Every structure is written in structure tokens, then in C-alpha cells.
Amino acid sequence: MLSGNGQLDANKWTPFINSQTWTTYILPGLWGTLKSAVFSVILALVMGTALGLGRISEIRILRWFCAVIIETFRAIPVLILMIFAYQMFAQYNIVPSSQLAFAAVVFGLTMYNGSVIAEILRSGIASLPKGQKEAAIALGMSSRQTTWSILLPQAVAAMLPALISQMVIALKDSALGYQIGYIEVVRSGIQSASVNRNYLAALFVVALIMIVLNFSLTALASRIERQLRAGRARKNIVAKVPEQPDQGLETKDNVNVDWQDPDYKDLKTPGVQ
């Protein structure tokens, strides 16, 4: 069927050799994808951190409030959030009409991914040994200091793979903006295919671009994770203090008594030589 429609012909790929195809369709769409993904990921990290910390707060009302927000926006599909935001922004003139689709895409991606990141953060902190928090409190640190200085850095390092996976999801979900007229790489690829009648080639190029983006993001995350682990390993190195001749018998590892020593006296049974 594809060969009958000419989709497998070599001339269907020639438009991608022409720079006009890239400057008119692909590159503007790629910029739209990257722009919406970067903005939404940054806002989702801020939102997720705030909701995640509120989720483990000692204030009960704050915990309930954050839990309601998290569970609500995690349950709503991203596309519905985008359509809702688009209609709301247009109805009340919240954003300029030229930025309407972009704002709706960022809103949908931020609310959904921020809620997921908040739950990832909460579970990451909850998985840490309780002894660390107890030790910090015993040292006189407040609950806030314990969370920011002890628990949060470890939780972020532990949940980094899950965070990167969520960022990849945000990057791919930006393609849903096609439904509300947002110019991103999938929409641009389809527009290019409509002009050149090469749907298979255009979709293949778009898929290849998304694969390269996701692979690059995953590789960057893996490198950051290795650096974090190496940094923690360097911090955990304990230098061994060399023993001094007059150190004395301070630990059981340093005690080496010769039971055949004639000068040894058993303190439990006085008089025994």
C-alpha cells in the first residue's frame, strides 16, 4: 500500500535535503518543542519540590491540601489540562493571544509533571533511613534544616533516574499541543508532509529527532548521576590514623596479649601466674 502510494520512493526524501524545509517547518517546530519542554520542566520541578515538601510537612492541613492537588492533577490527562487552560486563558484574556497555545501547553505539562515529581520526591524522602533524621534532630538541627541539608540532597540523588524519565515524558507530551494549534515538531512535520506529500518520510524524520533528543537527555542524566555518586563516594572516604608507639590499648583491635607472657597476671583470679 505504501509503495502503491509512492511513499517509499526515493524522491520523497529529497525535501529534507532542501534547507527551506528545515527553516520553514522542522526547526521552528523543534524550537517550539524544546521551549515548551524546558519551561514546563523548570516550573514542574519548582512545583513538585514545593508540593513534595508540603506533603511531608508536620502541619496536617498543609499535608491534606498538597495531597489533594497532587492526586487531582495526576488523575487528569495532560491533553484535557491543555484544552482547559486554552479555553480559560482565552475566555479571561489572561495571556496574549499570540502566546495562548504556548501558555496552555506549559500549564498542562507543569501541573501534571509537577504532581508526579512531588510524589516522587515524597517517596524518595520516605525511603531514607529514619535514623538520619533522628540523628540530625539529636544534634540540635531543626526539622527544616534536617529536610534541606540532610534528607533532600539524598532524595534528589536517589530519585534522579525517575526525574529524568519524567522529563522525557514531558518532552514527548509536548506533542499534544498539536491539538490546540501549538507549533511543535510533530505539527511542523505533518505540515511539511502535507506540502510535499511525503508522510512516511516526514514522520520518520520527526521520530528520529525525538529519539535523538530523548537519548541525549538520558545520556546527560546518566553522566550527572555518575558524578553525584562519585562525589558521595569521595565524601565517604575515611582516612586511617596511623598508630603511634605510645598509643596504648584504646580499642580491642589494638589489643594483642600474648598468653604465654610470663609477666601476665590474671586479674580475675589473683595469685595465678
UniProtKB/Swiss-Prot annotation:
Localization in the cell: Cell membrane
A Pfam family it matches: BPD_transp_1
Region (Disordered), start-end ranges: 242-273
Keywords: Amino-acid transport, Cell membrane, Membrane, Transmembrane, Transmembrane helix, Transport
GO-annotated biological processes: amino acid transport
GO cellular component: ATP-binding cassette (ABC) transporter complex
Gene Ontology terms for molecular function: transmembrane transporter activity
Bias-annotated ranges (Basic and acidic residues): 262-273
Role according to the record: Part of the ABC transporter complex GluABCD involved in glutamate uptake. Probably responsible for the translocation of the substrate across the membrane.
Family statement drawn from the similarity comment of this UniProt entry: Belongs to the binding-protein-dependent transport system permease family. HisMQ subfamily.
Name of the featured protein: Glutamate transport system permease protein GluD
Species classification: Bacteria, Bacillati, Actinomycetota, Actinomycetes, Mycobacteriales
Primary gene name: gluD
